[in-house]
Regions:
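Sec/SRP-type N-terminal targeting helices
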Residues: 85-86, 102-103, 142-170, 220, ...
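A short glycine-centered flexible hinge/capping loop motif at secondary-structure junctions
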Residues: 212-216, 423-427, 464-468
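Periplasmic alpha-helical coiled-coil/stalk elements that build and connect Gram-negative outer-membrane
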Residues: 148, 164-280, 394, 398, ...
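Terminal intrinsically disordered/low-complexity segments used for targeting and assembly
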Residues: 2-4, 12, 16-79, 132, ...
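Short flexible linkers and secondary-structure junctions
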Residues: 30-180, 316-320, 325, 340-342, ...
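C-terminal structured "cap/appendage" subdomains that terminate the fold
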Residues: 415-455
């Protein structure tokens, strides 16, 4: 093996260090101007002033309904829902793409080497030789025009958009879980009302049957009451089917099979109504993950446009390398004095001349994509404002009719009790009794649906206001709701 002199090796290392240093110092960068600003937002929501003063919803807004079971279901959904799992994996993919794009900004360093062992025999004897070679190289594309940095920035922003999309899926999921949970409880409450109506119908039927047997009631009255009893049975059957479907939908949102999936609560009585109101419309732009996703996607498209424009300019690549070898053919190598360390430094310049308009088409495509996402961003902002206004209007409307709903039930109960008493005494007619019973059932059932609508409106408002979302809310929420999911699993096992 050949021995390399220390002074030659030192000179080689100094030259290699100088070349590598030049590569590292040649890192260029470029900044992109921000995309066009969003449309002007109103100073206040039209229906916001009608609500009591309150703050924006927090990220655990669902806890405001006061249901431990709902908290457990939310934890299960965030952990096990398949759509949210897919969204999380898309974030991981986007992060990996961002790391790949970011690597192009930095110099590439590689090492290459090989070794060959030769052995042979002849009349003079046998011998063997070891030939080895090692080289360290570094290359860097000087980013004069900012193409690599713009590409990396676009990938980074794309990862941010994926996070906002994941959080949009999570917010939609939480709203869906709460809504379906309330639907199950409301249907059970309506079932309870339907059972009570059937029981009342049966009692009236027995009274009509007795009067018919006594020759007081007519066959028409008896047939009408029997029809009312059958109708009450049909309503119960229909509501039971709807309750089963709602439970199955809720199980799907939780990532659970519908078999043996149970909901403990039986009605809406244990739920509270959280106080929710909107802040300034301008704040909504940073509180809705779908709006943030649209904005981040727009910025990513702007960075892609900058990269497409930069691709039309020359590329300058710097390469430096140094290597050491041990010759396997001494007879040849010995004829070349000073064989040992070697080094090189190369600068390459590439300029597209004629590519049939490919680069220009890529630039035009990126420009059109930016304009498309700008329109999407504006549409997302307008849609978010409309969502809030509609939700606020619905809540305000339901607040206004609460007294009417309660009064309708109270007066219907009073009317039915009076009609029933008069009929039993023989001073009232059957049609009045039958109509008052139908009115009472309709009023109670309508009030149960009103309570559901009120809860669903609050869920919609929380979603429209962003559900307490901010840039770091998702990670915090996941950490806080995990114990509830584990508690549910422990209770179920």
């Amino acid at each position: 093996m050949r021995v390399v002199r220390a002074d030659a090796r030192g000179a080689c290392e100094r030259r290699l260090a100088s070349a590598l240093g030049f590569v590292l110092l040649a890192c260029g960068c470029a900044t992109e101007s921000p995309p066009q600003p969003p449309p002007t937002t109103p100073h206040a929501f039209e229906y916001g002033s009608a609500l009591p003063r309150a703050s924006w919803p927090t990220q655990d807004w669902y806890r405001g309904f006061g249901s431990d079971e709902l908290d457990e279901f939310v934890g299960l959904a965030v952990r096990d829902n398949t759509d949210l799992t897919v969204a999380r994996e898309r974030v991981a993919e986007a992060d990996a793409r961002a790391r790949q794009a970011g690597a192009a900004i930095l110099p590439k360093v590689s090492i290459d080497g090989n070794a060959t062992y030769l052995s042979g025999h002849s009349n003079q004897g046998s011998g063997h030789e070891l030939d080895w070679f090692a080289m360290l190289s570094a290359s860097y594309e000087v980013d004069f025009w900012g193409k690599n940095r713009a590409t990396a920035n676009a990938a980074r922003l794309g990862a941010g958009a994926s996070r906002a999309e994941r959080d949009t899926v999570a917010l939609t999921l939480l709203g869906g879980v709460a809504g379906e949970y309330f639907q199950v409880l409301a249907l059970r409450e309506r079932l309870s009302i339907a059972h009570a109506n059937r029981d009342a119908t049966k009692k009236i039927l027995e009274a009509v049957q007795a009067r018919f047997d006594a020759g007081v009631a007519s066959p028409t009255e008896l047939a009408s009451q029997k029809a009312a009893w059958y109708a009450a049975q049909i309503v119960i059957s229909d509501l039971e089917q709807l309750e089963m479907e709602a439970r199955a939908t809720l199980a799907l949102l939780l990532g659970r099979p519908p078999e043996n999936f149970e909901v403990r609560a039986e009605n809406l009585d244990s739920l509270r109504e959280p106080l929710v109101a909107a802040g300034l419309p301008s704040e909504l732009l940073t509180r809705r993950p779908d709006v943030v996703m649209a904005e981040t996607s727009l910025r990513a498209a702007h960075a892609n446009l900058a990269a497409a424009r930069a691709a039309m300019f020359p590329n300058l690549t710097l390469t430096a390398a140094a290597g050491v070898q041990n010759p396997a053919l001494p007879a040849i190598v010995n004829t070349i004095p000073g064989v040992g360390p070697s080094y090189s430094a190369i600068a390459g310049l590439t300029q597209p001349i004629f590519d049939h308009g490919r680069l220009a088409a890529q630039r035009d495509e990126a420009l059109a994509k930016e304009q498309e996402l700008l329109a999407t961003y504006r549409a997302a902002i307008i849609a978010s404002l409309v969502d809030v206004e509609k939700a606020l209007s619905t809540v305000q409307h339901l607040d206004a009719v609460r007294e009417f709903q309660q009064g309708n039930v109270a007066e219907s109960e009073r009317a039915f009790e009076g009609a029933q008493l008069r009929y039993q005494r023989g001073s009232g007619d059957f049609l009045t009794l039958l109509e008052s019973q139908r009115t009472l059932y309709a009023a109670r059932d309508q009030f149960a649906q009103y309570r559901l609508a009120r809860l669903e409106a609050l869920v919609t408002l929380c979603k429209a206001l962003g559900g307490g979302w901010n840039a770091s809310a998702a990670a915090t929420r996941d950490a806080e709701i995990a114990p509830a999911a584990r508690a549910h699993d422990a209770a179920s096992s």
